[in-house]
Structures are given as C-alpha cells and as structure tokens.
C-alpha cells in the first residue's frame, strides 16, 4: 500500500466520522442530503460484496465493514432517528437520473461480464456522481454549515489522493484501471468549484454561501 492510498483512506474515514458526529452532536441532519447518503450506501454495498467471497487483508476487510456500517448508520440517523430535522424540501435531486444511466453504463463498459464485476463497476461509476444531490441541495439553499463543508472537503481530498494512487501504481506496479481513473477524474472535477469556495471562504473563517 502506498502513501496516497493510505492518506486517501484516512481522509475518507475522516469525512464519514465528521458527518456522523455532526448529525449526532447537533441532533440534526439539516443541510445533509439523504439522497446522497443513500447513494453512498448503495456504492459500498455493491462494491464490497467480495467480502463474502474473498479475503485480501485485515486492513482491507475492516475498512470495508466500517464504510458499509457507517453508511447505513448515517441513512438511519437521517431517515429515522432525526427524521424531523431532515430538509426534504431542498433535497429534491432526482437520484434515479443517476442510478439508471450508471446501471446501464456498468453493463456496457466493464472489465468482465460477471455479476460481481458489473456491480463493482456500477459502484465506481455511481460514486463519481453520488455527491451531486448534496451539491444540488447546497445550490438550492445558497449556503452550507462549516462542518458540512469540512465533510465535503475531506471527501474531495480522498478522491484526489486516489488519483495520485492510480498514478503511483501505474509507474511502480504497472497497474492501470481506466474505469477507476476516469470515474475519479469526473468526481474530482465535480468538487473543483467547491474547493475554490472552501479555500477562499471557509479557511478564512467565513461561512460558505453562494452568490444569489
């Protein structure tokens, strides 16, 4: 494992912990897109089905279990425990417009036409756009809480670091996965505007708000 993957995993884990703590400590899921969290739960479920068929390492297994468990815990907090605070009026992105095309693409473009491989490919494609409902929600409300922006920043850093991980693996291991790289580039591009606002506003102590 190289440093880019390790720090990417830690950044991803930090994002998940930040989100869970934000919801639990504030007893509110205001400003959080439940639809994005459902999509992430679907991403981890379809990607890590290999937990049932193979063992790579203790680290790998633990991280997969943590991701799946935290994803469903987040969905539970939003749609059950703190449902009264969920802002469904602004969380209106049509998630099916992401899931259906991504599902079709996974069938057409994959490494191997087998159930597990198609589901893994589906998860890679879906993860690249799963944050769109959250970004759409922020665009509708015009602002985001600081802790929510920290969560999004850590997610963006995780994906950017994974791009460097693929570059490292190509040069030092001769490993190249076009599907993962293209999806990672798409996901990183989606965060670009947010990164700019994060650096110019949030890091300077200002609240992230979008122009009217």
Curated annotation (Swiss-Prot):
It is found in: Endoplasmic reticulum membrane; Golgi apparatus membrane; Cytoplasmic vesicle, COPI-coated vesicle membrane. GO terms for biological process: protein retention in ER lumen; protein transport; retrograde vesicle-mediated transport, Golgi to endoplasmic reticulum. Residues 25-32, 80-92, 136-149, 200-212 are cytoplasmic. Its main location: endoplasmic reticulum. GO terms for cellular component: cis-Golgi network; COPI-coated vesicle membrane; endoplasmic reticulum; endoplasmic reticulum membrane; Golgi membrane; membrane. Residues 47-48, 159-169 are annotated as: Interaction with the K-D-E-L motif on target proteins. GO terms for molecular function: ER retention sequence binding; KDEL sequence binding. Residues 1-4, 53-58, 111-116, 169-178 are lumenal. Pfam families: ER_lumen_recept. Keywords: Cytoplasmic vesicle, Endoplasmic reticulum, ER-Golgi transport, Golgi apparatus, Membrane, Protein transport, Receptor, Transmembrane, Transmembrane helix, Transport. It is a multi-pass membrane protein. The record marks 193 as: Important for recycling of cargo proteins with the sequence motif K-D-E-L from the Golgi to the endoplasmic reticulum. The chain crosses the membrane at residues 5-24, 33-52, 59-79, 93-110, 117-135, 150-168, 179-199. Coiled coil: none annotated. Residues 204-207 are annotated as: Important for recycling of cargo proteins with the sequence motif K-D-E-L from the Golgi to the endoplasmic reticulum. It comes from the Eukaryota. PANTHER family: ER LUMEN PROTEIN RETAINING RECEPTOR. Receptor for the C-terminal sequence motif K-D-E-L that is present on endoplasmic reticulum resident proteins and that mediates their recycling from the Golgi back to the endoplasmic reticulum. Binding is pH dependent, and is optimal at pH 5-5.4. Belongs to the ERD2 family. This is ER lumen protein-retaining receptor 2. It comes from Danio rerio (Zebrafish).
């Amino acid at each position: 494992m190289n440093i880019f993957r390790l720090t990417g995993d830690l950044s991803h884990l930090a994002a998940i912990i930040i989100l869970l703590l934000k919801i639990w400590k504030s007893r509110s899921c205001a400003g959080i897109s439940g639809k994005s969290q459902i999509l992430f739960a679907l991403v981890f479920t379809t990607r890590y089905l290999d937990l049932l068929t193979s063992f790579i390492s203790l680290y790998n297994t633990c991280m997969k279990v943590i991701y799946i468990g935290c994803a469903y815990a987040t969905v539970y907090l939003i749609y059950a425990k703190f449902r009264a605070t969920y802002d469904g009026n602004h969380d209106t992105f049509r998630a099916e417009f992401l899931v259906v095309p991504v599902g079709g693409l996974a069938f057409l473009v994959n490494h191997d036409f087998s159930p597990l491989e198609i589901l893994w490919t589906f998860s890679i494609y879906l993860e690249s756009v799963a944050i769109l409902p959250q970004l759409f929600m922020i665009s509708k409300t015009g602002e985001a809480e600081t802790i929510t922006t920290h969560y999004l920043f850590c997610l963006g850093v995780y994906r950017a670091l994974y791009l460097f991980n693929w570059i490292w693996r190509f040069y030092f291991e001769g490993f190249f996965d076009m599907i993962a790289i293209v999806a990672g580039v798409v996901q990183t591009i989606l965060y670009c505007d947010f990164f700019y606002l994060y650096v110019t506003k949030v890091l300077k102590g200002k609240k992230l708000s979008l122009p009217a």
